[in-house]
């Protein structure tokens, strides 16, 4: 889909920030800090077929639905993107995204690489950010330090991380999370800079020249 054929109203579009990262990179921590500093962010709530984790709430963290319901919605073109990850389906509803952006509000997406590639077809002008570990050795160390996953799951996550990193070449921005504070400063700066882009200020020039 081209920018010209997008379903969004370019006269009043918020900033869309898409953040992807392999498991263990620190994405959740960085996103939480960004949302705390910028509470104006709308957050894209995904649907998933996986069971809720401890302290997760339906309608707040995810919409937890059955596989049958997910497939039915997918066939109805309900999702802007969807993916099958680690044995479960994940998908981002399209309608709320369009409403949020057309109202001029900023929105944050926390999705995987498969989903980001699909979302690009609908939102090519979003800012796509990929978070990287400093090394694969460090990523393995972080995954093991959690103490929650079996060895086979750790190995699967490392394999997935390798595949995801190899697909990161098309993203707009890479941020290496070696130091959490430095990585956050870079993420914050990327967000603020994206708001200055002409593609998110389509009426600025017209308003400046109006009446001249």
UniProtKB/Swiss-Prot annotation:
Binding site for ATP: 21-28
Subcellular location: Cytoplasm
Source organism (scientific name): Lawsonia intracellularis (strain PHE/MN1-00)
Principal location class: cytoplasm
Catalysed transformations (reactions): GMP + ATP = GDP + ADP
GO annotation, cellular component aspect: cytosol
Keywords: ATP-binding, Cytoplasm, Kinase, Nucleotide-binding, Transferase
Entry annotated with the keyword Nucleotide-binding: yes
Domain of life from the UniProt record: Bacteria
Family annotation (Pfam families): Guanylate_kin
Protein name from the UniProt record: Guanylate kinase
Matching PANTHER family: GUANYLATE KINASE, GUANYLATE KINASE-RELATED
SMART domains: GuKc
Gene name for this UniProt entry: gmk
């Amino acid at each position: 889909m081209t920018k010209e054929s997008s379903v969004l109203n370019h006269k009043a579009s918020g900033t869309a920030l898409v953040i992807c990262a392999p498991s263990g990179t620190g994405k959740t921590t960085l996103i939480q800090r960004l949302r705390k500093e910028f509470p104006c962010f709308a957050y894209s709530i995904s649907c998933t077929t996986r069971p809720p984790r401890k302290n997760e709430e339906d309608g707040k963290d995810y919409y937890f639905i059955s596989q049958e319901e997910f497939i039915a919605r997918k066939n109805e073109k309900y999702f802007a993107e969807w993916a099958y990850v680690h044995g479960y389906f994940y998908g981002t509803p399209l309608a709320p995204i369009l409403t949020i952006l057309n109202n001029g509000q900023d929105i944050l997406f926390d999705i995987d690489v498969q989903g980001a590639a699909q979302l690009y077809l609908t939102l090519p002008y979003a800012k796509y950010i990929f978070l990287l570990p400093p090394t694969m050795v460090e990523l393995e160390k972080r995954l093991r330090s959690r103490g929650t996953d079996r060895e086979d799951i750790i190995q699967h996550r490392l394999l997935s991380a390798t595949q995801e990193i190899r697909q990161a070449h098309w993203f707009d921005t890479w941020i290496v999370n070696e130091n959490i504070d430095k990585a956050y400063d870079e993420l914050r700066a990327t967000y603020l800079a994206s708001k200055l882009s002409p593609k998110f200020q389509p009426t600025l020039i017209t308003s400046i020249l109006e009446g001249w």
